[in-house]
């Protein structure tokens, strides 16, 4: 069975697209593991959807303490990926992806990125050059990407939760 690690967290704008994609992959019998922070909403949202979740003790890079936590998280991520042996890693942006993507690079695990915003966030900007593919919501995102990397980008739009596709005639009135 194939295994994919999803890295997401912080806000619903990162978490819900990841859950939507993970649900579709689970339907194809792909084993999914989520890695996020142990401090934010993903620690509750992801397990509610019956996905395995591992939280890292990580903070945005704003202080010496957060840099130390980031370094420790890189080593923890290497340990997790070594144990789990995923076929792929998918990052959804945000500081949360940094230690796990570094671990994926160290362990030579292919990784993919998904960008929900028109302008790429710092983490995706830093890691897109070595990514296998980058899935973006908006074509305008390509304007900020060097020509030689554009073939890696695929405009997919933002993944939506299944509820957005189902009609409820009472709610439509």
Model-derived regions: residue spans:
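An aromatic- and histidine-rich active-site surface loop
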Residues: 40-44, 88-107
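Conserved nucleotide-sugar phosphate-binding/catalytic loop shared by glycosyltransferases and other
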Residues: 3-9, 26-69, 154-160
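An amphipathic, basic-hydrophobic alpha-helix
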Residues: 61-88, 98, 106
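Residue-level detector of alpha-helix initiation sites
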Residues: 11-12, 16, 94-96, 118-119
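Active-site-proximal region of nucleotide-activated glycan assembly enzymes
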Residues: 3, 31, 105-170
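Short amphipathic alpha-helix
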Residues: 14-25, 41
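Hydrophobic/aromatic ligand-binding patch that stacks against planar heteroaromatic rings
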Residues: 24, 45, 103-104, 126-127
